[in-house]
Each structure stands twice: as structure tokens, then as C-alpha cells.
């Protein structure tokens, strides 16, 4: 019997965002359904390594660090309640990763990353916002560690933005031109790649990995649990728009339903603790799915809030997320 193809996966399994973890799970599940062995690669960069060989001037280096710091800063300024929620979400995410994601390979430093790259038949990246501006300057997301002869694949990878700054064009073009199969999650991502690389580059637009599993397959993987006896609506708003939350409250009152709020760990608004009948802190991805399954409808500004409402055939109301230091496409 021939050996199964070995596929390295570049995902976001350690993020506290529900969508990031659930699409990591779905991607691994889908790839393995094709008869492949998978390994999720987690890269722990060694700060003493000087291994970025291309386009690594002082300005790109500074911008890359600045972008990274902004991601970390989204959690600064949380009050005591929201900080507690954030820490509980981190713990729940760790439990989910250990329970549902398998074959995780931690690479400490660039040399271990190179060794990992040599052990695969292909390396696949996707989905979420992996292609933020500046990632091509590094070694991991750019797949610079992947040797010739190992296929580079992106599945529905999101850029998270509609345009790149000009300083990113050359490195990003070199990164994308090396892919054997290139796809993104949004039409704007396809347009961005063609703008950077030229109109002749082949880019597909594919569905988010969470859609690769059917409602029944999600049920088989994460069994349904009844979260509340009374009828309710779920409010899952990552942003901090007060009027959106009050809109959900008015709807629930009009329909005579309880309103359940899955508390955001990325923003704070003055009504967070008093607009809902039930505030859920520290919910993990399993709880996220099950609260949606049992709801009459969902109010959300989240891509994956929308996705799991569609998968579970739920009525929903989708808001545009006002920028509050976080992305608007998750």
C-alpha cells in the first residue's frame, strides 16, 4: 500500500477567535478526507536568528513589528470583566486545540522549520487573515522555508484588506508567484493579488473551510448540547457599536425572547454588561456552535457568526463591524 501524502498545514490554531479555531479544525478534517496525513505547523521564531534573506530593510522590519504590536494592543485597556473573559477564552481555546486538533508540530527556530518543510509532499495555508500586509517579509507565512519540489497551496486564504501599501508589492508578488495553487476567500483578495502580480496570475475564490463540512458532519464532530430551556436570540458582536446591541435587545423584547450575549474579547462598550439577559463569558468554540444551534436567530458582525448560522439554517441579522482596532472580515 502506497504511503499517504504528507501535508503540512499553516493555520491559526492558537487564536482565541472562534472562526480561526473552527476553520483550522475544518481544514485539517477536509484535507484528511482526501486520504492525506496532515501536520499543523506552529512556528516559534528564534529572535537571534537572522534568516530573512530577501527584502529585509529597516523600514519593512519596523512596519512588520508595528503591525504585530497592533494585534497585541487590541487586548490592552480591557476592564476587569473583559480581561477575565479574555483569559477564560484563552483557556477554552487551549482545551479545544488539545481536544480537536491533532498532529501539531512545533518548530523552534528557522532550522527546525526548514527541516519540517523538507518532510512534506505539500504545504497548505488557509484560511483566515493570513495575508495581512507585510507577511511576505518573513519566512513562515510566505512559505520561504518550503523547498523546491514541495507543492505550495493556499486554500481560501484571506488578505484582510483590499489594498497593500506599495512597499509590500515586490515581496508579495514573489511569494504568490511561487504557489502551485492559489485561492482566496474574497473577491477583493483576488483583485488585490491580480493588482500586485498582474492579471494573468490564476487565482480562485473558494468558500471558507467551515463550509466544507455539512451540518450533519459538524454535528458528528461536535454533538449538540441544549444551552437554555427558554427560547432566545444570540448576540455575537465583536465590535463595540452600542446601537447594534440595543437593536438586538429591542428585537428580543418585541419577540418575547431572552437575549444571550457571547461577550467579545476584542472590544469594550458601555452596555456590554446590561443589554442582555444572559452574558456568557469564556465560551469556547463548542459553546459558540451550540448557542447558535439552539437560538431562534443571531445578531452578529462576525463572518463566522454568519457562517455557522447559515450552516445551522438559522435566521440572522448581520451588521457591518465598525473598526475598533480589529479586522472587519473575521
Regions found by a protein language model. Give the residues of each.
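Catalytic donor nucleotide-activated moiety binding site of glycosyltransferases and closely related
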Residues: 156-160, 237, 244-282
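Charged active-site motifs of nucleotide-sugar-dependent glycosyltransferases
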Residues: 6, 228-233, 257-258
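Donor nucleotide-activated moiety binding/catalytic core segment of transferases
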Residues: 203-211, 215, 264-301
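Aromatic- and Gly/Pro-rich donor/ligand-binding loops
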Residues: 7-18, 22-174
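A donor-sugar binding/catalytic signature common to diverse glycosyltransferases
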Residues: 291-330
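A nucleotide-sugar donor-handling region in carbohydrate enzymes
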Residues: 101-122, 131-132, 137-138, 156-231, ...
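Short beta-strand scaffold positions
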Residues: 125, 184, 299-300
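Structural alpha-helical scaffold elements that stabilize or flank donor/cofactor-binding regions
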Residues: 116, 175, 251, 290-291
